[in-house]
Amino acid sequence: MADQLIRATAADDGIRAVGVITTRLTEDARQRHGLSYVATAALGRTMSAGLLLASSMKQAEARINLRIRGDGPLQGILVDAGLDGTVRGYVTNPGVELPPNAKGKLDVGGAVGKGFLYVIRDMGYGYPYSSTVELVSGEIGEDVTHYLVTSEQTPSALALGVFVGAQGVTASGGLLIQVLPKAAEDPALVELLESRLAHLQGFTPLLQAGKTLPDIFTDLLGDMGLKIFPQTQMVQFQCRCSTERVLGALKMLGQDELLDMIEKDDGAEATCDFCGEVYQVTSDQLGKLIDDLKTEAGA
C-alpha cells in the first residue's frame, strides 16, 4: 500500500480523524541514516506524528517541527513535516540498540528516556508558535497526545506504530482521533469512542492484517456518521537541503574560516543531518563566498 494520508469526520463534524501510512518513507529514512531497529521505530513514529499534526494546518507552506530531547541513549529526535505531505527527520544516535521491553516490543521509551517534547508550528504567516511539554513515557504516541491535551486543549487519541524486521520496515503509520468541543459535550459519545480506542490492538497489526485506512475508520466510526474525504494525499520523505542552502550556511562562518578551509582542505564537505546528502564545496566556490563577503562589507 502506498504511503498516504486520509482525513475524515464523524458525529456531525464533532470528531476529526486522520490516518497516515508511512511504510516506505520510514524505510527510506532507515536506509539513509543506517538506523537500528529501535531508532527506526522511534523516528518512524515521530515522522507519522508530524504528518498527522501538520494535516490540520491551513496555509500550503505551513510546517511543524517536533524535537524530542531525552536522557536515554538515543539522545534526540528531530522531525520536520509539512501540510504538503513531505517529512524529514533524524535521530542523534542512529546506531543505538536495546533489548525488547517487558511487552516484548522495541523499547522506544527506554531509548528516548526522560526529557521534553518541543513543538514549533510555523503557520505560514512568519510567526512560529512554540510549546514545550515533559515526556510522559518516551514512546512518542503518549507524549504527543499529552502535548495535544495540555497545549492545544483538545481531547485526542493517537496510535502510532512501526514494524521493522530483517528485511526492513514492513508497516508504519498512525491514526489521530480528536474530539472537538461540539462532540465533547456528549458524554455517551465520548465514552463509546474511548472504549473502541482502548480495544485498538496497535496500528501496525491492522496494516499487516490487510486493513486500509478507510477500513480502520469504518471499524471505529462507521456508526457515528462517518464521512471520509475523497482526497487521498501522498506523503514522502523529502528534504529541502540544496547546494544554495549549504553555501549560505558556510557564508555565515565568515572570511577567516572560509580562507582557512581553502588553505587546509582545498574546499569543504558538508552533510545534511536530515537526509544524509553529502555536498562537496570547491575552493572556487569558497572563494566566491569570500568575495561576496568583502563586497558586502564594502557596501
From Swiss-Prot:
One of its GO terms (molecular function) is unfolded protein binding. It is found in: Cytoplasm. GO terms for cellular component: cytoplasm. Under oxidizing conditions two disulfide bonds are formed involving the reactive cysteines. Under reducing conditions zinc is bound to the reactive cysteines and the protein is inactive. Pfam families: HSP33. Disulfide bonds join C239-C241, C272-C275. Keywords: Chaperone, Cytoplasm, Disulfide bond, Redox-active center, Zinc. The keyword Iron does not apply. InterPro entries: Heat_shock_Hsp33 (IPR000397), Heat_shock_Hsp33_C (IPR016154), Heat_shock_Hsp33_N (IPR016153). Its main location: cytoplasm. Belongs to the HSP33 family. This is 33 kDa chaperonin. The lineage of its organism: Bacteria, Bacillati, Cyanobacteriota, Cyanophyceae, Acaryochloridales. The gene is hslO.
